[in-house]
Amino acid sequence: GGGNTFHLVRELQRTGLLQAIRQRAFDGMPYMGWSAGSNVAGPTLCTTNDMPIVMPASFECMGLVPFQINPHYTDFFDPKHGGETRDDRLKEYIMVNPRATVAAIREATALLLQDGHLSLIGKPNKMKVFKTRMENTQEYALTDNLDFLLK
């Protein structure tokens, strides 16, 4: 599902569906999520773009993948804005969470985990990865091997 990630996580936790879906996915059931639904596939909701309109019991999500997901990623910079960019916010997150990795995926793209291999699908055909160990972020294309994110 989509919508507000905080609301989705609260409802998934309240109904017991967070753990139920997680278990079914680990048992082999395909999982597909977009927007908030992709956020909840990661370990926590900490890299959502949403406002905290409600408070879930915790920020813990399904952990179907070992990295954070930031959907709707854009590296657009408006010089008139004067505020933080998405890159600034994601870099701040990994600085205070040194073991974290964030996969920032653009509109109309998705991550496909199949048979133990991870790939980017869709257009535009690039995504960004933010890691504390990297001095700069790295961009990856459709043809790149993304299996390193699974480690």
Language-model segments: what does each one mean?
Residues G1-G2, H7, A20:
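Hydrophobic alpha-helical segments and helix pairs
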Residues Q13-D27:
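A short, gly/pro- and small-residue-rich
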Residues L45-T47, M51-K151:
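C-terminal and late-domain segments of enzyme folds
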Residues L8-V9, G42, N49:
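Glycine/Thr-rich phosphate-binding loops of Rossmann-like dinucleotide-binding domains
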Residues G2, R10, A25, P66-Y73:
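Short, structured patches in soluble enzyme cores that scaffold and shape functional sites
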Residues T5-F6, S38-V40, D75, T109:
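Glycine-rich nucleotide phosphate-binding loop and flanking beta-alpha elements
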